[in-house]
Design a protein with these regions (language model features):
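ABC family nucleotide-binding domain
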Residues: 4-5, 10-208, 212-215
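C-terminal segments of enzyme domains that contribute to small-molecule binding surfaces
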Residues: 190, 221-222
């Protein structure tokens, strides 16, 4: 099996001096290409921090983080930003859409940054794929929560990433919209063979993944 992510003896500490907290302690983990993995655990267990490290948004204090064969811990900020733009898509609980941009413009932003030859054409394709062809020119404030998360998903998938990270993607949605987003997320992932790492408190959602990893107090439970 091809390894999408390999983590070796990962340690992460947050805070300063007396208030420092050991969030992750000696994590060892391998995720294979095309696999869907759910990260579960109580609040404060370290699952979101682990996702952020794998996505290149949080630094490791110690250890190695190999993503698509590249060592995040050896990259400078510019190299890491380029790598994220090419290989990684992220969907958060909060939609993080730019309020002054339309749905189409929001999805086109990462494509423009990556110098895609047709960012708006590609963005329109992705919005069509998530069922928002009729909302291209609407601003976030004109969209429902479910529609905003669809825009966020389209934005994450537009660069055709090899890895998709989702941190509580249904946390701000009602049950019906949450289920629709999950169905769409898994359908797109399956269609494109994208590696998925999903943080969730929902055991039913985690069960849809190929494998579930439980964290407790910064450790992976055996």
């Amino acid at each position: 099996m091809v390894k999408a992510i390999e983590i070796i003896d990962l340690h992460v500490t947050l805070g300063r001096e007396a208030s420092r907290v050991h969030v992750l302690n000696g994590i060892n983990l391998t995720i294979n290409a095309g696999e869907a993995v759910g990260l579960v655990g109580a609040s404060g267990s370290g699952k979101s921090t682990l996702l952020m490290v794998m996505a290149g948004l949080e630094q490791a204090e110690k250890g190695q983080v190999l993503v698509a064969g590249e060592d995040f811990t050896a990259m400078n900020e510019d190299s890491l930003a380029r790598f994220r733009g090419k290989h990684i898509g992220i969907v958060f609980q909060s939609f993080h859409l730019i309020p002054t941009m339309t749905a189409l413009e929001n999805v086109a932003v990462p494509l423009e940054l990556a110098h895609h030859p047709d960012p708006f054409g590609r963005a329109e394709q992705e919005l069509n794929a998530v069922g928002l062809s009729h909302r291209l020119n609407h601003f976030p404030a004109e969209l429902s929560g479910g529609e905003q998360q669809r825009v966020a998903l389209a934005r994450a998938m537009a660069p055709d990433p090899t890895l998709l990270f989702a941190d509580e993607p249904t946390g701000n949605l009602d049950e019906a919209n949450g289920l629709a987003i999950v169905d769409l997320l898994f359908a797109l992932r399956r269609e494109r063979q994208t590696t998925l790492v999903l943080v969730t408190h929902d055991s039913e959602l985690a069960a849809r993944c190929d494998r579930t990893i439980r964290l407790r107090s910064g450790h992976i439970e055996a």
